[in-house]
Amino acid sequence: MKEEELLKKRLMELCEKAYNQNIYTYTHFLNEYEQSIYQDMKQELAYAHPILVGGHKYFTRAVVMFGSEELFGYQGEVPVVCARISPVFDKFAEELSHRDYLGALMNLGIERHLIGDILIDGRYAYIFCMEHIIGVIKEQLDQVRHTRVFVEEVSWEETGYVQKYKKKEGFVASMRLDVLVSQAFSLSRNISEKLLKSQKVFHNGKMCLSGGQKIKQGDIISCLLYTSPSPRD
């Protein structure tokens, strides 16, 4: 609860600073739970025109930017950039996971809230981060696990990255949230209920504690920190 109150206070401070001083302000990267807190405050913060920015369309981690061209009369720059990590020797490159890339960044002393989404595309990875740490990543990240890598800053629009999806078909008794979570992630209703109570289920970016709400076509459901009971690497 203390962390939640601190975040609410910080959001209000950044909102007031942006509005009173006519300058753009930003949070660090927020996870989905933190974004849910922001969503609950959104109407209260609306006078400073806040928006979520993650660097790409389907973000899960994002910064809140306060301010707009309409409000200030000038366009602000979002301090979020994209780095592409590539193997130096493609022939000897390992198959690296999200955890591998994140661990390599954390080993450089980079704090988690400065890093956004990490998207993997074959032997390449795209990492969104705050602009002021891109230099550190480019200069110091030269190895992920046993694979030698090099880093370059890229424009996201020019990467050609295509979001990949896994299609799953099935029948559900109703369009309730808990039913769909169980079906989509192959979980028992009991585990789905535990995830909801543990604040790990989000519907269109808002945290859900009850599985009874109805889901519509096009809605987005996400679950955090679920580990399959079957062993896997």
Regions found by a protein language model. Give the residues of each.
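Ferredoxin-like alpha/beta domains used as RNA- or RNAP-binding modules
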Residues: 1-179, 183-184, 207, 221, ...
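Basic (Lys/Arg-enriched) interaction patch that binds polyanionic ligands
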Residues: 174-224
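Conserved small/polar residues in nucleotide/adenosyl-binding loops
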Residues: 226-233
